[in-house]
């Protein structure tokens, strides 16, 4: 009797399970997803418009192509317009590996001297075409400029048309002093005591004219040179075009030949063909993904960050450092690895601009030998590392030794997490096997040299430096990265079927590594070191974000996250812009959309310039870029192998839509939300990875070209047997969804650019 009862119950269970699955089977009629977006018109609402001419770097119009940069503003106190040029390749090559030995170097600017006195002016940055129009009204007439940095060619092109008596305005090249920007700042501030006594100045630039091409050649004491070349052509009586190239060579001294050849090639092609190819690149760039937000200001901000990223880097061009191609006098004329690089690159993954993220991959994967030289000699046989500040070839001062002084050793592992995110959004196992796995392994190896087993049977780290806080044993910053690194190496080895000799070591580390030091207020800085004074970095919270080792999927962790975040933010004295974006993303990680928005609003209220640039003691660009990722974190998350659609939406954000956002596992996701309710979701698998989604749709139906098997999991989570190349369309049962992505109409637009009434600096 008992046996028959068990058989009956088993059959009943199977029947109920099959019934559940059959309810979740798709309708075999494929849906379609469409975009109802007029891209030129939509992007025109995001444009930056200046109602008056800016006079500072923070307010200027900016253009770039991942190598060359241009900023346009009126010179303060002078009667000319300044076109500040930049080239990310231009840096010094001295033997000292610091900001005096290997910094980026300024190039100089063009001064547009009008015939009359400048009365006023306006500017308009056309994001869709990446072009700036400038109108200058003087006592003698009007000068109209159309400027762009060509998307593919290494050319800056400025076309001028004039009215009245301004046709004979003058261009003047003013070469910059080619010494470390930190030297320039200390010199201007009268802080000669902070300048190394043995610092030698580079020679001044020499200007010449060679067959219509003007040249400014800057030789460097340590070798190499920079040439800035320009030539002006005239078309009708009122039209003049300035063609500019900047070329840096090292150790060769052939920059002038390259510079002249680039200018002559561009002039032969002609202005309109050059403009056409430039616009084609940008018009192709933006539609890779789409986001529209219920707040016009934040929508404007988001798209300016996409423009900024594409202006600052390309896959085969410069790594984004602290200022991108818009270098100015700054204390930070290099790449900073203790937070800046990591924050800068996050937004490229979800926005599906992984082609741009390749500049970070190339910087690290192509300089393994240099990463080895950054490590003390005794550990170079199996370890890699990077110091706080590097040039674009990853050359830094030597990484410290744990237990000795201020050893900051976790920066390369943190950068490897960025590489891991790029991999997870692409799922290219060749990159994982041949590049990321070996790099991550040797970056984690450096930790392994110093782990010691304590009397408690746990593995402990000697004192290391928690970025910008203090040196402490069992530093949470490093414990988190070590734990994440070992987990990731084991996961990768399993995926790739690699029988690595260190597998048991990594397992042992995970088994015996000491827990994160905590107290009643959450995570500490490290062993016996509480968070005692205000700290702009969230290095001690890395296990929460972006590593998600402590996360809401583990119920006991939620309280730890809330306490740690609250206590960090309770000491506001030193909190700055990226303290806001970090707190926003941590809030999103636990589903608190209202808090996420509140933290983000603090950034907008205090730290942004009129052009979304960011200022601390000098210009830096990473924080606004990280805010784009904070917006992503509200709309879409994919950590832990699960796609979460609209995971942290503020109550006031009733309408949202996005299309083509990319997640870990290489899925493309589109979704629409109206009146606070999700209307539909569309997911396409690019790699065939397991597809698990969480949605607020209570009774979803799943449609596609075949019947998918859907497994229902707790918390409105579903696993879909989606194969590579397949698409699934998800909508509420009983409701008709149109699967059309369209922009949200706004009553305001063009929030950024310098305004006459609401001027911000």
Residue ranges: model-predicted function:
Residues 15-24:
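Bacterial N-terminal signal peptides
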Residues 29-58, 63, 67-335, 353-358, ...:
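Acidic/polar, glycine-enriched structural segments that form the non-catalytic walls/loops
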Residues 103-113, 621-670, 674:
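Catalytic cores of secreted or luminal carbohydrate-active enzymes
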Residues 151-160, 665-692:
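Carbohydrate-binding surface patches
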Residues 323-334, 380-402, 458-477, 523-535, ...:
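Carbohydrate-binding/catalytic loop surfaces
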Residues 337-373, 392-397, 404-426, 434, ...:
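Active-site core of glycosidic bond-cleaving carbohydrate-active enzymes
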Residues 442-492:
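Acidic/histidine-rich catalytic neighborhood
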Residues 676-761:
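C-terminal beta-sandwich/jelly-roll accessory domains of carbohydrate-active enzymes
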